[in-house]
Amino acid sequence: MRREMPYTAGLGERYGYATGYRATSHPSLPNYLAMSGGSTFGVTDDHDPSAHPLAAQSVFGQALAAHRTATVYAEDMPGPCFTTSAGRYAVRHNPWTYYVRERAACRRHDLPMTGLSADVRAGRLPNAGMVVPNTCSDAHDCPAATADAWLRTVLGEVMAGPDFTSGRLLVVVTADEDDHDQGNFVLTTLVNPQLHHVVVSSPLDHYSLARLYAEVLGVPPLQQARSAPSIVSAFGLVVGPGH
């Protein structure tokens, strides 16, 4: 990874990264559900939302219910909360579209990535957010170097914005799953001005990421995130509604 993704590796060395972070399963979709809902909900495939209408709460819906903000930015998505794949947009990588009780909120706040730059410049990035690259930018269909260049562009802009420079924004860079060759360990880097050369070897997973959303929002963790190891504790972060 250091050779193929030097920018991303450098971020981890400058701020922090986890060496013991695992995905929860294969294929992609169950991992995104674990991140966003604290459970795989028994899903074992990558089918569209029409096959898996989840009557559960997501971290994004939980944020809105707590009067906080939530936005998903999906690269190349044809329209808000788009529930089928199109071109390089893969709906299996956009988990909010599966939570059918939150579909109205999804249509308002699950948006094409074209709106990200304006929100960065205005300092209005959400309390609970996710950026979903297309299947080239995420290295699924293109080399890892392509993903590294994409991250350099996107994170360079985000890290120059007021949400990050003020210390309010924590960025987590992770992957849904490994290539079936690494024990499902996945690259996970944390970027925030609080962090300086932090390396965490303790076990973490996508349920830990769902718990992180809850800890940032100041709300109870969902499903299996309740018992997941805490990223906040592991990295020594200070988070919550007052931070």
Region spans (language model):
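Flexible, surface-exposed loop/gating regions in the mature catalytic domains
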Residues: 1-243
